Amino acid sequence: MEYPIQRHPTRAEQLEILATVLDDTVPDGGRLLDLGVGTGYVAHLVLSRRPDLDLVGIDLKQEPLDAAKINLPNGSGGGRRYFVQGDLNRLAEIALPHASYHAVMCALTFHDLADSAKQAVIRWVADSLVPGGRFVLYDRLRLTEAAAFPLQQSLWRRIARVHGTAMRDAEDFDTYVTDLGQTNRPAALEDYLTWFRAAKLSPAILHLHGNIALMSASKA
């Protein structure tokens, strides 16, 4: 199984918080949907605490799903595991085993989507949640203020100094924007808050470290 926190040391606390809030808030035997399950690392953090949960993991490619099937066997606590190959840009074609979910999580997948697709997924998630359900989203944020960029550079240097591993850097704000390219498309925090509210979800910021955010959006 891939261990992403080895390359990005500040992720450890944020992912632990993600697992904690789902552990604390999803009911016994609840249904959890993971958008972009990959090989199952983040799902494993949750299921190691809550083997009773039914997990449905979606991923674009079959290869990581095959690995996830090995890494995430059916739980000793009674939870079942389902793996679905699906494209978040083609939501109508994704066939899910359950009609509704107590929680939906997504870690480091949204920045691959165009903003229009992000909004469509958020609306789809809102429709899929039971009343009181939550969407927990962990992803990069787009930096939008050139004047504040030196502060982000300082955070990156601190990570390298404290942890001995550099996450990334850019000489200036324009270089940062250029380096994002056409396929790395993080959204701004303000956009996420607007999109959540438009889908009638109540947003909250659970943890923010520079341009990496752990957010939630709850259904009334």
Residue ranges and their predicted role:
Residues 2-19:
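Conserved SAM-binding loop and adjacent beta-strand
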Residues 33, 41-91:
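Class I SAM-dependent methyltransferase SAM/SAH-binding core
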Residues 36:
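Conserved S-adenosyl-L-methionine
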Residues 90-98:
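Short conserved loop adjoining the S-adenosyl-L-methionine
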Residues 105:
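A conserved beta-strand element that flanks and buttresses the S-adenosyl-L-methionine
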Residues 119-131:
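A short glycine-rich, Lys/Arg-flanked "PGG" loop and its adjoining helix->strand segment in the class I
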Residues 138-195:
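C-terminal alpha-helical "lid/dimerization" subdomain adjacent to the S-adenosyl-L-methionine
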Residues 201-220:
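Core SAM-dependent methyltransferase catalytic element
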